[in-house]
């Protein structure tokens, strides 16, 4: 995306390249929804908000998948969903290659992402923009040469892309579950700094198990909570169920098992965790094989059914957040 006119930007002794010009982008509008943080509070257009979301990590896999998500946003919104998460790279089995080897955004995938963000903004919804996915996925097979500097460039390019399009209803996860940090020892603090160097107002999350850096704006998923800052569970699954383990994966099978299928106990635990994080923290984003499975089993960008084998899906959870008391 940013390959023609570049200028250097230095921070912390590093140098990254940012665009002087790019393809035509939407005109900045005063009526854009804007996400901010005030202390431990998340705010949308200045009003406190609790995150209630669905993890659509494979939404960029095809034009049809992107279109299906957009077509169902109103339905998700009707249940109280106000947030979706979309990943530029990954996720497991989906293998979206949203970053090119030079750390720029692939224009095919970024165009899909922009459509989703615009559609979400029109519905007063928030988008978690996920960047690096360094786990079990073919998404990184062309990036073996990357270094810390390349990772920083990727995050900086992502934030620049968001800024140029005036996408303000977003926050950014630089490194999903600290996977790149664990595999390559790349420092997430530097990635966050790279993003903030481009746009200090961009909300940068921390998503790893080690001590969060001071420059993280909020903690999500794997991160320990940060005193005085928000925390969101951004990949919520049924606790104590080995959901991402043998329940949904099998050696030698390059797709998920039990797609969109839940036991009664799983549902009960998922609902309890949802309430715990909405009432006791800043929100909850559900993750499901129903939403993430690649073809031919998914991705399913719709609610589906009651989570039984005959009627798989996450409608049961959506009905829970719609009907539960409280924020």
Language model regions located:
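Active-site mouth of glycoside hydrolases
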Residues: 34-216, 225-229
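Bacterial N-terminal signal peptides that target proteins for export
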Residues: 1-12
């Amino acid at each position: 995306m940013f390959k023609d006119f570049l200028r250097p930007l230095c921070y912390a002794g590093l140098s990254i390249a940012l665009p002087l010009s790019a393809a035509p982008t939407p005109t900045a509008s005063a009526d854009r929804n804007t996400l901010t943080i005030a202390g431990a509070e998340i705010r949308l257009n200045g009003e406190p908000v609790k995150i209630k979301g669905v993890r659509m990590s494979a939404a960029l896999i095809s034009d049809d998948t992107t279109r299906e998500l957009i077509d169902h946003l109103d339905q998700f919104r009707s249940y109280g969903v106000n947030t979706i998460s979309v990943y530029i790279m990954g996720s497991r089995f989906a293998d979206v290659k949203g970053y090119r080897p030079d750390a720029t955004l692939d224009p095919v995938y970024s165009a899909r992402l922009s459509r989703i963000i615009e559609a979400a903004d029109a519905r007063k919804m928030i988008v978690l923009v996920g960047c690096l996915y360094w786990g079990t996925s073919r998404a990184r097979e062309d990036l073996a040469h990357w270094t810390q500097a390349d990772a920083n460039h990727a995050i900086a390019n992502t934030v620049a892309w968001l800024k140029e399009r005036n996408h303000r209803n977003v926050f950014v996860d630089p490194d999903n579950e600290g996977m790149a940090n664990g595999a390559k020892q790349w420092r997430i603090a530097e990635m966050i700094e790279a993003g903030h160097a481009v746009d200090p107002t961009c909300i940068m999350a921390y998503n790893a198990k080690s001590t969060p850096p001071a420059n993280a704006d909020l903690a999500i998923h794997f991160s320990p909570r940060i005193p005085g800052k928000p925390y969101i569970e951004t990949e919520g699954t049924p606790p104590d169920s080995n959901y991402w383990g043998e329940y949904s994966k099998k050696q030698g099978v390059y797709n998920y098992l039990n797609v969109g299928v839940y036991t009664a106990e799983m549902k009960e635990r998922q609902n309890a965790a949802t309430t715990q994080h909405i009432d006791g923290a800043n929100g909850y984003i559900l993750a499901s094989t129903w939403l993430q499975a690649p073809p031919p089993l998914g991705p399913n960008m719709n609610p589906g059914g009651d989570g039984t084998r005959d009627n798989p899906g996450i409608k049961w959870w959506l009905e829970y957040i719609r009907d539960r008391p409280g924020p």
